[in-house]
Regions:
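Short, surface-exposed charged micro-motifs
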Residues: 177, 204, 242
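Conserved metal-binding segment of the jelly-roll/cupin
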Residues: 225-240
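Asparagine-centered strand-capping/turn motif at beta-strand->loop junctions
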Residues: 241-247
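Fe(II)/2-oxoglutarate oxygenase catalytic core
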Residues: 1-200, 210-213, 217-219, 223-225, ...
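Short Gly/Pro-enriched loop/turn and capping motifs at secondary-structure junctions
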Residues: 210-213, 240-241, 260
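A short hydrophobic beta-strand segment most commonly corresponding to one strand
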Residues: 200-207, 232-234, 248-267
Length: 273
């Protein structure tokens, strides 16, 4: 049986002994009351094309938007592009042009393009409620807080949530995102970094104020699957991870950055007790 990468020999680290979660009920209330007043986006619709999904996910029937776009005719591509901003130098008649769209590209999808892909081509976006409280430009800079801060809107609409995040044990925060999943949707098993290529375990804290999001980690063959049973946790994103479907909306917030110098040792000590 293949094994999880894990952290300190465990599938994930429950941080609830080290971080006070007594305010989660109030945080959840704030988030649910304010989310209808902001404009979340979609994300995750090109994970297969990005090459980060588990092998069994790659063969499932859920449509990936970049794979769909790569199969467009000239007319289909022109129509799709018309729903957003055309890429720089876009020429639908140039045989040597291969434009990429969406996450981790220079051509983010517009809201209209996302909906068009979903309605017309059945593209599946796992996270239809994605809201950045603190923005990052690319995946590679998600641990650097250089020049970054929480958005004015996030501070205004989610003050209690931002205050909680700011007291977490980070030296710097490079990204903070609310990932929400609609009723009956799932997040496919994927990993954020590849074992053997990353020098260290990426430092992040995720928290689920409601405790009802069935987030899991699993081994490379999908044989060993562990549902995270903790309100706040650190997991190894070299492990495949995803979210099982449920008949209701679920969400969590992930904070990426660099831990305070002694936090990892405090975690080690807590695991030995």
């Amino acid at each position: 049986m293949s094994r999880l990468c894990g952290i300190f020999g465990k599938p994930y680290i429950d941080l609830s002994e080290l971080v006070d979660t007594s305010g989660f009920e109030a945080i959840d209330e704030e988030l649910m009351c304010a989310l209808p007043r902001v404009e979340p986006s979609y994300t995750g619709g090109s994970l297969k094309w990005m090459g980060v999904t588990a092998p069994w996910v790659d063969a499932d029937p859920y449509a990936d938007y970049m794979r769909v776009i790569e199969g467009f005719s000239r007319e289909q591509l022109v129509r799709f592009v018309s729903y957003g901003k055309a890429p720089e130098g876009f020429d639908p008649d140039a045989a040597d042009q291969h434009h990429h769209f969406g996450d981790e590209t220079d051509n983010p999808l517009s809201r209209e393009q996302m909906l068009y892909l979903k309605y017309r081509y059945g593209v599946y976006f796992p996270w239809k409620v994605c809201y950045h409280l603190l923005e990052n430009d690319r995946w590679e800079d998600k641990h650097s807080g250089d020049g970054k801060d929480f958005t004015e809107e996030a501070r205004r609409m989610f003050p209690r949530t931002v205050a909680f995040i700011e007291q977490l044990p980070f030296q710097e925060i490079g990204r903070c995102v609310l990932f929400g999943i609609e009723a009956n949707d799932h997040a496919p098993a994927h990993r954020d970094s590849e074992p053997g290529k990353a020098l260290a375990i990426a430092q992040s804290i995720s928290f689920d104020p409601r405790g009802n999001k069935r987030f899991y980690v699993c081994d490379p063959k999908g044989e060993n699957k562990t549902i995270v049973d903790a309100p706040i946790y650190w997991f190894n994103d070299m492990d495949y991870h995803g979210v099982d479907p449920d008949p209701f909306f679920r969400y969590s917030i992930r904070v990426d950055g660099v831990f305070e110098n002694d936090f990892v040792e405090r975690i080690r000590a807590a695991q030995r007790r």
